[in-house]
Amino acid sequence: MLICVPGILSKDDVAEFRHIMDSSDWEDGRSTAGAQSAMVKRNEQLPPDSEVARKLGHRIISAMTANPRFLAAAIPQHIFPPLFNRYAADSGHHFGIHVDNAVRGDKLTGLRIRTDLSVTLFLSEPEEYDGGELVIEDLYGSHEVKLPAGDLVLYPASSLHMVTPVTRGVRIASFFWLQSMIRDPLARSMIFDLDTTIQDLSRRMGRDDPEMVRLTGLYHNLIRYWAET
């Protein structure tokens, strides 16, 4: 399940983020990569324990958890503190094909999560750079993702994925992982489809329609059946 969520950050928010990051120090992105990923990772990132990364990360989490589409798709239990990366054409930056670690731990908070979903929040507009597509492999083939600044994409952390070489400009993004209350990806996908259907039908039929009440009850009972807390 690959889901795009528009407008997590406003354009003004993105501009503020970029202004702050432009005056920040960046380090080699391999510092947070696993052994295999480090061999194919060439980018820079804000130090994960820096005050800038933590403050901007908190703002992203607050914005995401106020977004109904994100909540419906992810059903988050734990969200890893967002990280920030930078791919520059003049440095030949890219990230070869890899899969994310199954478990991530945060040294500052002690949080350890199972990485069910990977998240990329774009902070550069598509016209600011060439290349830099996020390429995600799944059962249906290969998908290239390059979204407007402020939009994010959710995809299974078990997916093989890569970032193609940036050949012009600079690509800046936030990336992180989350553990969902619904561990099984098929169950999570069905829950999301049911939620979307309920929202669409409620606009036509009204939330107090008896059939809508039954469907809403089914939604909550399925979450009750599958959820891990």
Curated annotation (Swiss-Prot):
Ranges where the Fe2OG dioxygenase domain occurs: 78-180
Domain of life: Bacteria
SMART domains tied to this protein: P4Hc
A GO BP annotation: intracellular iron ion homeostasis
Keyword S-adenosyl-L-methionine among UniProt keywords: no
Cofactor: Fe(2+); L-ascorbate
UniProt xrefs under Pfam families: 2OG-FeII_Oxy_3 (PF13640), PKHD_C (PF18331)
EC code: 1.14.11.-
Keyword Oxidoreductase set for record: yes
PANTHER family associated with the record: PKHD-TYPE HYDROXYLASE YBIX
Entry's cofactor comment: Binds 1 Fe(2+) ion per subunit.
Keyword field: Dioxygenase, Iron, Metal-binding, Oxidoreductase, Vitamin C
Top class in the EC scheme: oxidoreductase
Binding residue positions for 2-oxoglutarate: R171
Any one GO molecular-function label of the UniProt entry: 2-oxoglutarate-dependent dioxygenase activity
Lineage: Bacteria, Pseudomonadati, Pseudomonadota, Alphaproteobacteria, Hyphomicrobiales
PROSITE patterns, A to Z: FE2OG_OXY
Protein name, entry field: PKHD-type hydroxylase BBta_1313
Binding-site residues for Fe cation, renumbered to this chain: H98, D100, H161
